[in-house]
Structure formats: C-alpha cells, structure tokens
Amino acid sequence: MASNEDEAISMQESMTDEEIKELFYAQEASILLEAFSEARPKRSGMTRVFPDGKVILEGGIEESFINSNLTRVPIIMGTNKDENKFFNSLNRNFVKWGPATGMYKTVGIDEMPIEILDLDYYEAVNFYGSSFWKQRAVDTTSSKLVVSGHNKNFAYRFDWDELSTINGLDMSKLIGAAHAMEILFVFGSFDSYIVKNFLFGEGAYPAGKKLSDQIQSYWAEFAYNGSPGKGREGNLPEWKAWSSGQNDKYLVLDSDNDQGVYMSNLEYTQDYLLDLSLIHI
C-alpha cells in the first residue's frame, strides 16, 4: 500500500471504481474507523463529509433542501437565541477570567469568568453571530424546503436565559440561551442538585420547569403524529409548520417570566441582518 499521501492519491487515481469498492469491502470495520479517527482537516474544524454522489448527494446538503424528488418526512429544526455566547465566553478578548474563590476553588476550579470586558460589544458580537447561524441553519433552509414542496418543517428558537449569578457574574448575560442549553429542557433534566441550585436565577425554576414540560409535550406529540401541534394534551399554542410570505414561521420557546411560547413570522435573511447592522453603526 501507499507510504504517503502522494502515493495514495496516485494509486487511487489509477484504480477503477470496482477496484476501489473491492478494496473498501475487504477491510475490517476497525481499520475504516481508525482511518476516520486519524483523519485531520487541512484547515481548522472537524473532518467533514463530502458529496460523493452515492451516500451524499453531489450537491451536498444544499441539494436536499431544493430537490423535490427526494422523500420528505416531518422535521424539527431550531437554534438558540444566544448560540455563540458559550464559545465567546471562553474568549479572553471578550471576557476577563480570574482565580476562582470560595466553594468553587474548594471543588478544584482554578479559573472562572469574572467580568465581561465590554458588554455592548459582547452582546453585538453574539447577536450577529447567533443570528446569522439561525439564518443559515434554519430560516434559509426552511424557506428552500417550502419551495421544494416540503410542508412539514417545524422550526423553533430557544430563548430561555434566566440564569443565576455565579462568582459575581450574571450568567444570563455571559451565557444566556447558549449552545446546548435546550437539551436540559427537552429531556427534563432538572433533578440534579447542581442544575436546581446553580443554573436557575432567583424565582426562575417554576417557570423553567413549566417550559420544559411544554417542550416535552410538543416533542412527544411530534413523535406520535409527525406534527407538534398543540402538544399531547392539546392545550399549548399551536406550533405551525414554516410557511412563506408574512405567515407564522417558527415557535419561540421562552418561559412565562419573559415572552412565553408563541409563533413568530420574523424571518432572518441576510438582507434583514445586514440592514440591522447598518442601523447600529
């Protein structure tokens, strides 16, 4: 076999499709998994799938949004309002970190965030980063799916951000409705002492628990019937499928302490977000 990448490329180009197929089929699963785990992207980030035209469409994931010949099934897709905050909270250009104190130091935590250096700048960076992610991952995708004839795409934006103050820093501003925060609500994982006593801000638990129950009800109804509707008991605001024009598009998931649960017709497009940025300059 090849001893380096150049030799491997040369060998691959000299082989027929059938020979490549036979080579892969002859390998043990462990060999294939080892090769995948050792693969590294040429730049940064994770190793990406590639559109081979067999497993993945030649047009990549984009083609799956617009190809009306594909089988369509109901989908739930969504993002979090403050998606980027978790990652940016680790960036020392935005947040000052310092020695942990008190019980946090006792349990072995050495450093903790202690100050957002420029709150307005931090909020702006996170708003646009999170909003453009929503635009790419949900809104543009959903619009393309509707055009291709897919009418059972249920979108959401998770907005809950009623977090506690830790080490003197308001977590609702530092983290907010950040990456993966919704997972706790989908699975109702509130029994942990740490979650109950350190996640929720003052007075936030009852409304947060109610929101979790609502989310689970929507998810369960979707699993049963392919549409979240009004939840299992039929007593929640109707979660409608994404639609075009000025109609309702996605469900905002927040607690009664703030906005509550409601449908929104505000679509995040590149033009909309760029216009906002010009207003703020």
What kind of feature is each model-predicted range?
Residues 207-230:
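Non-catalytic, well-ordered alpha-helical segments in soluble enzyme domains
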Residues 279-281:
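Conserved small/polar residues in nucleotide/adenosyl-binding loops
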Residues 2-22:
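Short, charged, surface-exposed loops that flank catalytic or proteolytic processing sites
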